[in-house]
């Protein structure tokens, strides 16, 4: 651990200590050593969403007041958070992804701005609202991943374009919503488009000039998924051709899948990114349009040089027309940063039948001399792995209402699916929990090294799910399912909870009327901040969950809470501007229950709390 002094005299521990800095993003590493900055999309490379700042505490939080606001001039969903380095704050908006640089020492004056010229038609290809999830900083540059696929490097001082590279092509349905992640001499970015039959990937570009360093696809041959002979060496059962036995025809109506035990599974198989896509597929060689979107928040451990991320759902949502386990969709992977080669990869929802997108963030934490990787998956289970080997330590339901599977085998990582929850073409499966947007969607959880707990926003939403026939056409939606959504058995649509990451047992739980769609922030004063769809910005006690403070902002808050220090004062903030999957139907005036992939019906009451479309704004508070 490195000990630093903040401007407030706090001794701050920077977890996952780094070796000597001799690479492009040395300025980013230096900035992250000072807790007054927020130089990474989640604060630090470990993705914890934690700050050592503690000026705002339980004793004085009642005095927290609005310090300043900034209207972005753009409507609809504002996710992610700004980047703060020294006296400069950098903000990106929803489409068209305008960037503003504000001087915190000069009344938040706009020092420079950048306005991308994007084709408005790109908006029609964005799956779940016009969102983007933040900016990257390093090597004297601000990195912008535009919705239209352009990755752009801007000079942090004046906003002038340094380089740009085309990462995805909206003409075939491939877009971007992720924040670029700057790590050492590379900029990592991903790909969205599983609802358009896009074969997605994670890519690393050289920070200096934008040249491609490596690209790893979510599906396909080992040479293209960057799996080698040593991938999953510590857990060969993760490399299995099949982990289920078909029951009553498997993919046929009335069929289901029985989990194989560890001694029944043959591990150590190769070329699984093609061989687990069995015939007949909806389209020849289905893996070539296999989805596996990558757009979350990706941690990095300099001690092992591993970067971690989740890949999303397979295309198409109709499971009957893509038999097989469909690797490596629905998978958390650890890759070598320099080469992209996978050290380990575990598929969480083999042969997905519910769109339980596996893209959610991974969080790294240390305990008793070991490093662990934690992930709250949309499928309703929280997973804890040995971060170096990929061995599964714990996997538990985050809430009792999860009813598609009983449990997860810790030896194989395979869930025990329930036959009653299987979905089939032209059959309307009812009462499945969670809904396709999962027990948690894009909203990242946070970890506190002070309490040793994870803090997670929650969706408590169930669904009906009916797969339907759908033909692939490049650049057109390719979903293949009809959904409706409704509140879970708790009678609410969301919540916020604390978990012990070594067991994934719940410590405390607060109900929320709607899904908590905002990313969480933890601080050294044992306070947790998050936002809600009914416009509240809240602070709760990290140890008990007791509400300490709240303020109602102008639109639903789906951004990530963040904090920074300036001139001896701590500030905490959040972006508001309702949207995302939960809010897109309201923004577009959709009223049929099945619109917006079921969100229109499930979230119809949002119109009682929000004007549409939601106006984007940054809300900043201090004592």
Model-based region annotation:
Residues 25-72, 109-124, 160-169, 211-220, ...:
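Aromatic (tryptophan-biased) beta-strands that constitute blades/sheets of beta-rich domains
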Residues 38-42, 77-98, 124-150, 175-199, ...:
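Repeat-blade elements of multi-bladed beta-propeller folds
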Residues 44-168, 523:
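N-terminal cofactor/phosphate-binding cores enriched in small/glycine residues
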Residues 103-107, 155-158, 206-209, 337-339, ...:
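Short loop/turn segments that connect beta-strands within beta-propeller blades
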Residues 175-212, 219, 353-408, 421-433, ...:
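Repeat-solenoid scaffold signature
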Residues 260-266, 270-382, 386-391, 396-400, ...:
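Beta-propeller domains
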Residues 562-623:
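Blade-level signature of beta-propeller repeat domains, shared across WD40, Kelch, NHL, RCC1
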